[in-house]
Amino acid sequence: MKPRMCLILFIALMRVMSIVSAQSSCTNVLISMAPCLSFITQNTSLPSQQCCNQLAHVVRYSSECLCQVLDGGGSQLGINVNETQALALPKACHVETPPASRCHSGSSVNSHSEHGNGSKTVPREKSSSDGSIKFSFPLLAILFTASYITLIYAKY
């Protein structure tokens, strides 16, 4: 493969990956809510502490993505969300969230209201890291492509 062709391929991949990355930002947030699956897909009576910690994190940093859960965002991942359980999650975790009615009104979900669904008590996040390194799919694809191009280019 000629160097010019490699460059064109790399630029095309970068454009595609930037589009995918923009579309999947909430998908990554939904995936991070995996500890809550047993609560929002089944009728488990209490969510785990890990679920509550993750919910508090999402509310703090990506609350707009919570609307996607209520709007069927879980179905794109093959998950059937029990909407009643999903709406009960903030109260069960004692996490204040913006009202669910804001999801359909078009207003910003990030602006907090006095009338949240849950309590004002938010669980503290653990300060210790689990030691894992998390890469996004676009970054992995770019690294893979760059290494492949380097390997091909080195042969010529």
UniProtKB/Swiss-Prot annotation:
Region (Disordered): 99-130
Glycosylation: residue positions: N43, N82, N117
Compartment(s) where it occurs, according to its Swiss-Prot or TrEMBL record: Cell membrane
Comp. bias intervals (Basic and acidic residues): 112-128
Tissue expression from the record: Confined to the anthers of the inflorescence.
Residue span(s) of the pro-peptide: 129-156
Disulphides: C26-C67, C36-C51, C52-C93, C65-C103
CDD domains reported for this sequence: AAI_LTSS (cd00010)
Signal peptide extent: 1-22
Lipid-linked residues (GPI-anchor amidated serine): S128
Any one GO biological process: proteolysis
Entry GO CC: plasma membrane; side of membrane
Domain of life: Eukaryota
Keyword Transferase belongs to the record: no
Family membership: Belongs to the plant LTP family.
This protein's name: Non-specific lipid transfer protein GPI-anchored 26
Protein's organism: Arabidopsis thaliana (Mouse-ear cress)
